[in-house]
Amino acid sequence: MTDSTTGIALLPGIDGTGIFFEPLIHVLPEDIPLSVITYPPNSILSLEEHARFVAEYLPTEDVIVVAESFSGLVGLELLHLRLPAIKGVIFSAAFAEPLHRILIRGLSLIPGIGSMVKELPVPVLDHFLFGNFSNKDLANLLERGLPKIDAKCLKHRAEIIASGYPRLDEHFDIPCLYLKAARDRLVPHTAASWFAAHFNHFACVEFDAPHCLLQTVPAECAAEIMGFYNVLRDRNPSGIKNEE
């Protein structure tokens, strides 16, 4: 049984649309208050502005934040605000340290690079993002999601990724669950170690899946999310072990 007063807020990956949460939403319990954050299109936001945008749309009741990939940085910035409603955080294939700095900054010099990425053939992106987990539903999700992505925002968020979280020495006392992708080709396997070292209550669960965990193994991720949810519902953060 869930506690309907505690909600879950989903923060999207670099696309910013929220549409790619569909596979996860379909397997989460229907009675949980769920908020899907969509970053504003045509708005170039700094990392801090992303976090403050999210803060405005978070439920006023207790909430657990699920931050996917790029939004791991937003989630950290959000935690820096010390909002009392946030009772726990789940990072999916996230990172804190600067990522692919040379590659991203080199590509950013190419005019129209954001639009080029959007225009890549769906089968190419499907294979790169989902690998052997690819199926018709995920391909269809890409076909529907790509037109919704703002190319300029995509490029700017990539630049934020290249910069990383600006307060790498910061520590957090809030309970944290890290969902790790064993087949991740975008985020290094060592990324979880930063979170293990900077969260006092930390757990890590690894899946034999690619970077897009919430799309390729949604049921397995939902089970871990709900396990974490139930621990916090019972107000027992000490039950979250440091396993990394």
Predicted regions: what they are:
Residues 23, 174, 188-197:
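Short alpha-helix in the alpha/beta-hydrolase fold that links the catalytic acid
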Residues 45-46, 209-222:
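Catalytic histidine-centered segment of alpha/beta-hydrolase-like enzymes
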Residues 172, 178-180, 184:
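Short beta-strand/loop motif that positions the catalytic acidic residue
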Residues 183-187, 212:
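Acidic catalytic loop of the alpha/beta-hydrolase fold
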